[in-house]
């Protein structure tokens, strides 16, 4: 056991985490030259394309150290994006140490910091590494000081390497062996294994990545999943060297994969504990929580024939993604579809892109909303994730909106812009600390503002230097209203949005102006109105197309012209009564972009 090292890599997006892991695999000979692909561990196309890591992955490498001993290195790859922070904390719980990889050109960023604090709270050994020292812009001394100031760990001895060219990678491996402690655990104790991640394989069912904390796991053991109390037989188990290799047992401290015929990913939730069915442990490992979606949106297939395929596609995606929530929803305007819950906007974009790309579907998305806590007049509390479910105004006591605690790291030159942005988004400042040239600002912002476009706006006001980390804090009573959109006096349910009363008027006006551009002109006037309850707050009109009916009268009598105009007017009136308006898909997208311009 003392020759095992479990570690993960903490790094901000694009600081070279996946490239470094490629190098480690190459040096330890996990894959032959021919099998090396760039970013071996990012197995989904979309992960490679966007250059981000979404799912946690693991690799077991054998490394012959300079002291002549052979060490088993278990490396668990973690996602870096803020939407996937729960997966990060699960990956860290399985390790004894973490490599803090920082780009020697850019310095420390907020998500790195957030994950690093998580690691320190879990009492992991944090080993700083300065990457990309081959770049002309690299300033390792300055960045080392920054790490010491902001994170507070000793970085003067930090290993310098360049994952791309391979300089210093051997030093990194030596550092892992010397600085990170071996796993603790009792091989004789009852089995306790932490599920780091689960995914669905078409042939094997659910494959779980586990870390054995105590005891050992053998083939054909009967095991129990502690949160569901279901018992399964272990069919196969083994390790990844990135390739799946079968073994007969996993010992204390090791990380490997287990297949036990579970059909549904909810049967092996991430962060849960496995133990033996007979004589197993009674206590589960700490830190398990059910992942709650933060953002909801309605997804509808463009043609209703696709509904069945869409349902199957969602089912297949949710096998692999336990944090995706969906339930059927129908809308008068859009037909049948699903209300889906996501961790954040990035997660939503990724799911939508995967549905369109892998399952060939055309989808319409309604405006994303967060979950509101609603107190009705009879004191019952509801959780509302869609504007359509909001009770009528006279039944409402109050609406509480979710508040997110946002930690922003920004160079002091851009502090003013960032504060202006936070105030505009109804933020309340909690804290501000200067670290050298960087400022750490903490704000409480409404979740609805954060998920809409806060991240994009933050990046643009700070020229891309600010970084953000947020998590849900609490519900707070707020003056929220539902803005409905009416076309010719009829409500279109799919276009409603929930917004704050102070900005409802301007949002409403923006919305109707935006929609006016997208609705094609008809033979009659179309009134687009935004309303709160029965109170109209904004209106614009798409003008009718009309034929010049008096063109054929040569200078004729005025009464003749009046007669023709009156006849046209009556015809238009009749059309307006029976005519209905087709909404193009662009009109729905207009709503999504209303806050962004």
From Swiss-Prot:
Boundaries of every tr-type G domain copy: 2-184
Question: What EC number(s) does the entry state?
Answer: 3.6.5.n1
The yes or no answer to whether the keyword Protein transport is present is no
According to its UniProt record, where is this protein mainly located?
membrane
Q: Name one GO molecular function term.
A: translation elongation factor activity
Tell me which UniProt keywords the record has, alphabetically: Cell inner membrane, Cell membrane, GTP-binding, Hydrolase, Membrane, Nucleotide-binding, Protein biosynthesis
Entry binding sites for GTP: 14-19, 131-134
HAMAP family, sorted: LepA
NCBIfam families recorded = lepA, small_GTP
Protein's job = Required for accurate and efficient protein synthesis under certain stress conditions. May act as a fidelity factor of the translation reaction, by catalyzing a one-codon backward translocation of tRNAs on improperly translocated ribosomes. Back-translocation proceeds from a post-translocation (POST) complex to a pre-translocation (PRE) complex, thus giving elongation factor G a second chance to translocate the tRNAs correctly. Binds to ribosomes in a GTP-dependent manner.
This chain's protein is named Elongation factor 4
Q: Which organism is it from?
A: Vibrio atlanticus (strain LGP32)
Q: What is the lineage of its organism?
A: Bacteria, Pseudomonadati, Pseudomonadota, Gammaproteobacteria, Vibrionales
């Amino acid at each position: 056991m003392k020759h095992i090292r479990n570690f993960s890599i903490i790094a901000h997006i694009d600081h070279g985490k996946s490239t470094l892991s490629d190098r480690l695999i190459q040096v330890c000979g996990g894959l032959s030259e021919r099998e090396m692909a760039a970013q071996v561990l990012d197995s989904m196309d979309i992960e490679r394309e966007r250059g981000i890591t979404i799912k946690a992955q693991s690799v077991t490498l054998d490394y012959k150290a300079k002291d002549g001993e052979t060490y088993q290195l278990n490396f668990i790859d973690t996602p870096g994006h803020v939407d996937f922070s729960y997966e990060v904390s699960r990956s860290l719980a399985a390790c004894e140490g973490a490599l803090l990889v920082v780009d020697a050109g850019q310095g420390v960023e907020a998500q790195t910091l957030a994950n690093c604090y998580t690691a320190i709270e879990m009492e992991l050994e944090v080993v700083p590494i300065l990457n990309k020292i081959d770049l002309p812009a690299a300033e390792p001394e300055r960045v080392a000081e920054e790490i010491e100031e902001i994170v507070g760990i000793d970085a003067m001895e930090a290993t310098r390497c360049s994952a791309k060219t391979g300089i210093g990678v051997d030093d990194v491996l030596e550092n892992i062996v010397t600085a990170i402690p071996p796993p603790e655990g009792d091989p004789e104790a009852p089995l306790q294994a932490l599920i780091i991640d689960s995914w669905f394989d078409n042939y094997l069912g659910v494959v779980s990545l586990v870390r054995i904390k105590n005891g050992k796991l053998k083939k054909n053991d009967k095991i129990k999943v502690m949160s569901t109390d279901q018992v399964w037989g272990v069919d196969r188990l083994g390790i990844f060297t990135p390739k799946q290799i079968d073994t007969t047992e996993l010992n204390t401290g090791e990380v490997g994969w287990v297949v036990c015929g579970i059909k549904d990913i909810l049967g092996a939730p991430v962060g849960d504990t496995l133990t033996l069915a007979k004589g197993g442990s009674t206590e589960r490992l700490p830190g398990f929580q059910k992942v709650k979606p933060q953002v909801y949106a309605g997804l509808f297939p463009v043609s209703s024939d696709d509904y069945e395929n869409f349902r199957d596609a969602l089912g297949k995606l949710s096998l692999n993604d336990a944090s995706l929530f969906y339930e059927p929803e129908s809308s008068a305007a859009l037909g049948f579809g699903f209300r889906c819950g996501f961790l954040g906007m990035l997660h939503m974009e990724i799911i939508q892109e995967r549905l369109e790309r892998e399952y060939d579907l055309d989808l319409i998305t309604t405006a994303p909303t967060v979950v509101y806590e609603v107190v009705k007049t009879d004191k019952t509390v509801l959780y509302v994730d869609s504007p359509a479910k909001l009770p009528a105004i006279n039944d409402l006591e109050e609406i509480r909106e979710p508040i997110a605690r946002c930690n922003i790291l920004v160079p002091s030159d851009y502090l003013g812009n960032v504060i202006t942005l936070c105030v505009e988004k109804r933020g309340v400042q909690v804290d501000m600390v200067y670290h050298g040239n960087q400022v750490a600002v903490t704000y409480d912002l409404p979740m609805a503002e954060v998920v809409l476009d806060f991240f994009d706006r933050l990046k643009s006001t700070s020229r891309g230097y600010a970084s953000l980390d947020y998590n849900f804090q609490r519900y707070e009573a707020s003056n929220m209203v539902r803005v409905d959109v009416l076309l010719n006096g009829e409500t279109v349910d799919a276009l409603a949005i929930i917004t704050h009363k102070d900005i409802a008027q301007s949002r409403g006006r923006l919305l109707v102006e935006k929609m006016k551009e997208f609705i094609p002109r008809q033979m009659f006037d179309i009134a687009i109105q935004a309303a709160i309850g029965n109170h109209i707050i904004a209106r614009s009109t798409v003008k009718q197309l009309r034929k010049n009916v008096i063109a054929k009268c040569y200078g004729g009598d005025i009464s003749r012209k009046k007669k023709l105009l009156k006849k046209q007017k009556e015809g238009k009136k009749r059309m307006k009564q029976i005519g209905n308006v087709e909404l193009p898909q662009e009109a729905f997208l207009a709503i999504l972009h209303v806050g962004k311009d």
